[in-house]
């Protein structure tokens, strides 16, 4: 099937938040069964939000990818503040949660800087920096992850 790429950012993008893009992963007006959904972050804003990827199953997506655009100057260079940044929004929940399902083959998260915002609030053993559940394969690659407080589980 098709690869459907949507831009995420503030300057003339398809979506202004990651949550809005994720909410449309089950939209039949955008995707068809077997499609590969790609959300591309742009370095024109800091995304202050927690990520929860659990869509795409009812429409039958093949893969889901959240990455930064590969346009020149947009991807991080292995150092802080050199590409799209997602900053932890809530000390009361997991920062990145992927709840896969049997119909989506894989979820890939790549080339993004994740800033825990120095969250040192302990919320017990049930809060994580990255939480993964489900049957979907998860690939977390070429990301920067920093400032995750000592009170949280990694």
Regions found by a protein language model. Name each.
Residues 73-91, 115-123, 147-152:
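Acidic/polar low-complexity surface segments
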Residues 11-14, 33-64, 68-74:
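N-terminal extracellular ligand-recognition/capping segment immediately after the signal peptide
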Residues 37-40, 65, 112, 128-129, ...:
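Short Gly/Ser/Thr-biased coil->beta-strand turn/linker motifs
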Residues 3-41:
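Acidic Gly/Asp/Thr-rich repetitive segments characteristic of extracellular carbohydrate-active
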Residues 67, 104-116, 136-149, 154:
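Right-handed parallel beta-helix
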Residues 50-52, 89-100, 120-133, 151-154:
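Extracellular beta-strand/beta-solenoid scaffold signature
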Residues 18-32, 47-58, 77, 97-100, ...:
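Short, T/G/N/S-enriched strand-turn elements that build extracellular solenoid repeat scaffolds
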Residues 35-37, 49, 62-64, 94, ...:
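The right-handed parallel beta-helix/beta-solenoid scaffold, focusing on the short coil/turn
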